[in-house]
Amino acid sequence: LGVFMMMCSVSNAIFVGLPMCTELFGESCTPYVMLYYLVNTSFVQLVGLSLVRWAGEGGGFDRRMVKKFLTTPAVIGVLVSFVLVFTGIQLPPLLMSYCKYMNNLVTPLALLLTGYIIYEIGLKNLKLDRDLALVMLFRFLLVPGVSFALCEVFGVAGLGRSVLIVETAMPVVTQTVVAAAEYGADEEFAAQGAALSTIACFVVIPVLMLIL
């Protein structure tokens, strides 16, 4: 149940979400993606991993998860970037160029990761049973639908709304598979969900863009 809940509630915001949003909306969407990532990964580290651990070892929240979250390189990078933006500090052009080159690696790395996950599972082993169908329903219909409704209620429009809806329609976060293996939960179910949702994402997003 813990693995199922994590698969339904959190998405792959960076490895798939960032390159997807960048291609769709341009680099101006990056701050919105990073903000979503910060909230998304906070939920993963502080709630999602506890659910998976509860489903596997029978444990729950561990204080070490907070330390792990705060020392994650991506989280540190996001927090530092917020400080730079609010203080108006400009980094040297050479360093900015280096960061841009590193950013350009995200898309090919995401494709490699996606291919590796699908290869590890094997297309013949991908079976859409009832539980996985429910995950797909949450991942690509209910969660984006709720996000759209919340945007309407709170008056969120424009690029911010588009990024939020696309990000919530991203595949199952691959960390679910890693956590399931680490804590003795249903790793096969998590891996199949990650692979199927990644494949489905490339069909769902074009349809979603027509609606947006």
Where are these regions (language model features)?
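Alpha-helical transmembrane segments of multi-pass small-molecule/ion transporters
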Residues: 1-212
